[in-house]
Curated annotation (Swiss-Prot):
The chain crosses the membrane at residues 21-41. The gene is ftsL. GO terms for cellular component: plasma membrane. GO terms for biological process: cell division. This is Cell division protein FtsL. The keyword Cell division applies. Residues 1-20 are cytoplasmic. Keywords: Cell cycle, Cell division, Cell membrane, Membrane, Transmembrane, Transmembrane helix. Essential cell division protein. Pfam families: FtsL (PF04999).
Amino acid sequence: MNKNYNLSKIIFNDLISFYKTQLILIFMIFISALLIITIIHKTRLLTSQQEELDIIKKKQMPLNLEKYISTSRLKFKHEKIDT
């Protein structure tokens, strides 16, 4: 009278009956980690695309305008605001 038990089924039933909240929390942590990775990846792609557009715009910019922008940025960096 050997009775065969399906161990994986027993473990699964125990997990569902006794550890529901822990399983839900682990699942939510896993989902949030995947979402964070996806958001970071998309943000980096958008940043690199923006940098490429800036490079293209800079190449198309006339030299006089480029000098004006660089000198005006320097002026704003060194100005002090009195309060």
